[in-house]
Amino acid sequence: MKYSIPMKIPNQYQTNCLLKEITTFGIGGPAKYFVEVRTIPDMQKTLLFCYQNEIPYFILGKGSNSLFDDRGFNGLVIANRIDCLEKNEKGCWHVGAGYSFSLLGSQTARQGWEGLEFASGIPGSVGGAIFMNAGANGRETADNLISVDFVDEQGKLIHFKRSNLNFQYRTSPFQNIKGAIVSATFQLNASQEARQKQLSIIDYRKKTQPYKAKSAGCVFRNPNCGHAGALIEQAGLKETKIGGAAVSSVHANFIINSGLATSQDVLALIRLIQETVKAKTGAELESEIRYVPYDVNQG
């Protein structure tokens, strides 16, 4: 696909931005175009621009849970930097989709509000957490969500009430809608125990996960028959390597970039894990990492 972006795009953009430098996996070639969007009106203009000019785009939050192709991305990567934060005395928090989900979890707990403690340590944005319905410790992002503001592919701003959205385990309706989550509102409850819960969660996460390694977070959804990490370990795959990609020695549901890993290394390791776990345990593991091909029109 050959195209160029005229200068009327609402934000200053970069060309050939290395995606490995802005993702937690540390993998990915250059994006043909890259832009940071900091306001909802600019997101509306940017998505409408892409729609009118038939330019493929990818919405990026904090760069976790995404695996870009080694060749990069033949389109526009839109980094969501909408990071507003407002709250009232009743525990209603309105937050931009580009805000750190981990920071939101620690801030709310520190101020005595319960409901998002589990977010502490999850390396993604609020928008990404809603998109994937991220969760841990028996809680999910959707549990305390009351509304989501979304910009569709034609730049229209839509307000969704939680009651009209169908969330399931690690899935949201936004995975099937073109556009971008731009903000959300959470209803939290006052709790004197919130801070201690949050500190316990982050302490446990640091001890049981490869906290500082280059990874995209948990690779597989937990199947009905058990925890993905335990099944992978049961299959004898802990520390298995393909190229620079390796199954973590700390937590088997993490693939880490142990060196100069490529996207193909990671994809090959994912397939190996799925095939081996299926053969040895009968369980089918479904990846929750979003692989982004170079050309989205070819897959």
From Swiss-Prot:
Coiled-coil ranges (or none): none
Subcellular location: Cytoplasm
Main location: cytoplasm
Keyword set, alphabetical order: Cell cycle, Cell division, Cell shape, Cell wall biogenesis/degradation, Cytoplasm, FAD, Flavoprotein, NADP, Oxidoreductase, Peptidoglycan synthesis
Protein name (database record): UDP-N-acetylenolpyruvoylglucosamine reductase
Biological or metabolic pathway of the protein: Cell wall biogenesis; peptidoglycan biosynthesis
GO biological process: one example: cell division
Gene Ontology annotations for the cellular component aspect, listed alphabetically: cytosol
Gene: murB
Family under the similarity heading: Belongs to the MurB family.
InterPro entries given in the database record: FAD-bd_PCMH (IPR016166), FAD-bd_PCMH-like_sf (IPR036318), FAD-bd_PCMH_sub1 (IPR016167), FAD-bd_PCMH_sub2 (IPR016169), MurB (IPR003170), MurB_C (IPR011601), MurB_C_sf (IPR036635), Oxid_FAD_bind_N (IPR006094)
HAMAP family attached to this UniProt entry: MurB (MF_00037)
Cofactor (UniProt): FAD
EC number: 1.3.1.98
Role of this protein: Cell wall formation.
Residue ranges occupied by any FAD-binding PCMH-type domain in the UniProt entry: 26-191
GO molecular function terms listed in the Swiss-Prot or TrEMBL record: FAD binding; UDP-N-acetylmuramate dehydrogenase activity
Catalysis performed (reactions): UDP-N-acetyl-alpha-D-muramate + NADP(+) = UDP-N-acetyl-3-O-(1-carboxyvinyl)-alpha-D-glucosamine + NADPH + H(+)
Catalytic site positions: 170, 218 (proton donor), 288
